[in-house]
């Protein structure tokens, strides 16, 4: 009974981080120095649905992060399902990525490596959203709470790399055992200069 409970709790954690990532502002398509806008804004930098401007959008993101003195290593491009589809339709890009990789991309469920970014799909992100970031742009904290002294049984369980609390006790009101899995978790933008977003036209 613990495994499905732990899976259910762990599945909520990426959604929280996805909500935080979706707040990152996009560069304006015509002027990278202008104030950022929401990725849904008509002025926002966007991938074309036919994929014809993939490299241009990635180059713009690099320009913005480079201008903010963001390190070149540990750069990731996390994309929603709609943007992921655009990348997957670009056979030339995928062929280059896979031929240079010896199979690691497939093992890691990575879409491609392009312009210094590792491209990954994140279902918790909005479909038409992409966020370019360096690993220190965001923080995710997950903590298993202490087991209360009154619990009949309590322990930590691991699920998808997260530590969760499992407690059991008896509920006399309903004459049944209770099993609860929970954790404290939160996400935040640590440094907005280390991330920029784009939408999908």
Predicted regions and their residues:
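Short secondary-structure transition/capping segments
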Residues: 27-29, 65-76, 123-125, 161-171
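Generic secondary-structure signature for well-ordered alpha-helical cores
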Residues: 6-14, 70, 172, 184, ...
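Structured, hydrophobic secondary-structure cores that serve as assembly/anchoring elements
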Residues: 61-91, 95
